[in-house]
Amino acid sequence: LGFAAGLVALALLPFLGTDFGKGAVRWYSLGFASVQPSEFLKPCFVVLAAWLMAAAQDVAGPPGRSVSFAVALVVVGLLAVQPDFGQAALVLFGWGVMYFVAGAPIALLIALAGAAVGAGVMAYNASEHFARRIDGFLAPDLDPRTQLGFATNAIQEGGFFGVGVGEGQVKWSLPDAHTDFIIAVAAEEYGLVLVLFVIALYAAIVMRSLWRLMRERDPFIRLAGTGLVAIFAAQAMINMG
């Protein structure tokens, strides 16, 4: 039910959503707040895909792996329309990790990874928004007027111990200071010490979760947990990197 609701919300975004001037229609504006359906859809998708893959392990079970892949393609397609290729990549990554844990052949996973890279190249050539984001990230000379430039400067200004609580300036320059660039804000005010603590905390959560899942015998719990941890870890690395 949660997946169905999230899928409908994602499908209606091009008609009822807003981009807040950022070039990608990813949110619903509620006036007092905004909602990004993909954030709710990801865990629901993982649970559904895990259930399908686990059911496929029964002798008389459904073709869960194929069905879960088809569902993943639907989700990725809706995300590409926004366009939100980052979230689409996370969905495919989470599905790929679950498929690997479910016993997928390595050769097939390599082929799927190659197809994903090819799709990324096509997206780069087809989407000006996506190409601009990639070019900005890979540019050897970072433009200090971009969000990435502001964030990098904030981290440098923070040093080891930071400039002090509430003394940071980058939060006034970044529209996403409270989400995508929260680490840059924290690094400027609290320094590298806090950043290293946050990284260690994320690493501890991921390692502890994987250790627990390695001992799990229920295939559904093992697959769902692995998919959730994979997306959690990948998104943390992207936002902190």
What are these regions (language model features)?
Residues 1-144, 187-241:
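Hydrophobic alpha-helical transmembrane segments of multi-pass inner membrane proteins, especially
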